[in-house]
Amino acid sequence: MLVHQAGILILQGLSGAVFGILLFYLLGSLLTRRWIRIDLYQLLLSMAVAFLIAIVCEVYLGKLYQLLTGKPLWQYRVWPIHDGYTSVLNFIVWPVYGYYCYVLHHILHARQISIRPAWLKGLVSGFDGPLLEILANGFFLLFYGTFYFYYLPDDMRHFTSIQVVPLYMVMGVILTLVLDYLRERPRRWHYPAGFYLAGVGFVLAG
């Protein structure tokens, strides 16, 4: 029974991931006016690094928020772990954020838009992160009748919250700096493999 339920939840996560990947690819191709050509190494690197950094940041920044305010900012509703600060399904979902970052990087490069210093680009996550959360929660509510995660403040109808913006900025700066560093390193497949496996280990530790 537990295996069956886990299988259903994993399929739900995969459906959301496929939806996000298709949406971001089509929007990116539309904005660049040509089909985006995928560099498999750079794509997998972006997805793996985003997975590890995002899942660690959401747990520890979430705990820091609770330490400072006395209450949590969000709680996962689907397969929660690490005291509800993240979900087992994020081994599927968070890499899609890395896919989004890859597409965004491609769009900026195609349009010859350079944001410097590099950390400034990371601050963008403070604005696009909450929008993507609304998309994720909207998908789960529409197709599965539940919030994927639930924000306790009701300033954004519990889909996300303005209060999460600075947390996304911190995570975005870390992610941008790490990715920029690794993109300039010689290609080594142990980078994406290592980051992804470390993220899976963090999930299993929850």
Provide a role label for each language-model segment:
Residues 1-206:
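Aromatic-rich, lipid-facing transmembrane alpha helices and their immediate juxtamembrane interface loops
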